[in-house]
Amino acid sequence: MSEPSRDAHQIPHGSKACRRLFGPVDSEQLRRDCDALMAGCVQEARERWNFDFVTETPLEGDFAWERVWGLGLPKLYLPAGPRGGRDDLGGGKRPSTSSTLLPGTAREDHLDLSLSCTLMPHSPERPEASPGAPGTSQGRKRRQTSMTDFYHSKRRLIFSKRKP
């Protein structure tokens, strides 16, 4: 085998191999571009939904916004918070409050809508059977569906010369 080239030994072993293909990064310009893009997105959403998402106030337009207090929301949408206190928004536990709320907005105005699930421990006295195993009381067994159940396949005609 040939010896390694001398150029490979010029790179110190402790340095990273990093290439800047398009020159140095201007952090200020990058921040300005991101801010301009974000402002454009906020303005587009404001015009589309007639709602100011920065100050969280409804605007005049095609939509009529009204406050929903959560009394009609199912408890599925009212997650349990770290505190045990009840909330006046829907009867569920009070959602966790975030310190990142905008200044000037009340914490009571926010309702955190998220889903939560609880894992149930497997009981050792009842072994888990496979869904298709005999003796399970699941009712009718569903079969595996395939794409041709929804889309009918078409036969393709292939014309070829016959062998003599």
Swiss-Prot record:
Modification Phosphoserine, positions: 114, 130, 146, 160
Report the residue ranges where the short sequence motif Nuclear localization signal is annotated in this entry. 141-156
UniProt keyword annotation of Nucleus present: yes
Q: Where is this motif: PIP-box K+4 motif?
A: 140-164
Q: Give residues where Phosphothreonine occurs.
A: 145
GO MF annotation list: cyclin binding; cyclin-dependent protein kinase activating kinase activity; cyclin-dependent protein serine/threonine kinase inhibitor activity; protein kinase inhibitor activity; protein sequestering activity; protein serine/threonine kinase binding; protein-containing complex binding; ubiquitin protein ligase binding
Q: Does the keyword Repressor apply?
A: no
Q: Where is this region: Required for binding CDKs?
A: 53-58
Q: Which GO terms describe its biological process?
A: cellular response to amino acid starvation; cellular response to cell-matrix adhesion; cellular response to gamma radiation; cellular response to UV-B; DNA damage response; DNA damage response, signal transduction by p53 class mediator; fibroblast proliferation; heart development
- The UniProt entry lists the main location of this chain as cytoplasm
Q: Which segments carry the region annotation Required for binding cyclins?
A: 17-24
What's noted about post-translational modification? Phosphorylation of Thr-145 by Akt or of Ser-146 by PKC impairs binding to PCNA. Phosphorylation at Ser-114 by GSK3-beta enhances ubiquitination by the DCX(DTL) complex. Phosphorylation of Thr-145 by PIM2 enhances protein stability and inhibits cell proliferation. Phosphorylation of Thr-145 by PIM1 results in the relocation of CDKN1A to the cytoplasm and enhanced CDKN1A protein stability. UV radiation-induced phosphorylation at Ser-146 by NUAK1 leads to its degradation. Ubiquitinated by MKRN1; leading to polyubiquitination and 26S proteasome-dependent degradation. Ubiquitinated by the DCX(DTL) complex, also named CRL4(CDT2) complex, leading to its degradation during S phase or following UV irradiation. Ubiquitination by the DCX(DTL) complex is essential to control replication licensing and is PCNA-dependent: interacts with PCNA via its PIP-box, while the presence of the containing the 'K+4' motif in the PIP box, recruit the DCX(DTL) complex, leading to its degradation. Ubiquitination at Ser-2 leads to degradation by the proteasome pathway.
Residues in cross-link Glycyl serine ester (Ser-Gly) (interchain with G-Cter in ubiquitin): 2
C4-type Zn finger ranges: 13-41
GO cellular component term of the entry, any: cyclin-dependent protein kinase holoenzyme complex
Extract the ranges annotated as region (Disordered): 80-164
- Check the record and name the Pfam families matching this protein: CDI
The region called Interaction with TRIM39 is annotated at 152-164
Q: What is the similarity comment for this entry? A: Belongs to the CDI family.
Q: What's the domain remark here?
A: The C-terminal is required for nuclear localization of the cyclin D-CDK4 complex. The PIP-box K+4 motif mediates both the interaction with PCNA and the recruitment of the DCX(DTL) complex: while the PIP-box interacts with PCNA, the presence of the K+4 submotif, recruits the DCX(DTL) complex, leading to its ubiquitination.
Function summary: May be involved in p53/TP53 mediated inhibition of cellular proliferation in response to DNA damage. Binds to and inhibits cyclin-dependent kinase activity, preventing phosphorylation of critical cyclin-dependent kinase substrates and blocking cell cycle progression. Functions in the nuclear localization and assembly of cyclin D-CDK4 complex and promotes its kinase activity towards RB1. At higher stoichiometric ratios, inhibits the kinase activity of the cyclin D-CDK4 complex. Inhibits DNA synthesis by DNA polymerase delta by competing with POLD3 for PCNA binding.
Q: What is this protein called?
A: Cyclin-dependent kinase inhibitor 1
- Organism of provenance: Felis catus (Cat)
- The gene that this protein is the product of is CDKN1A
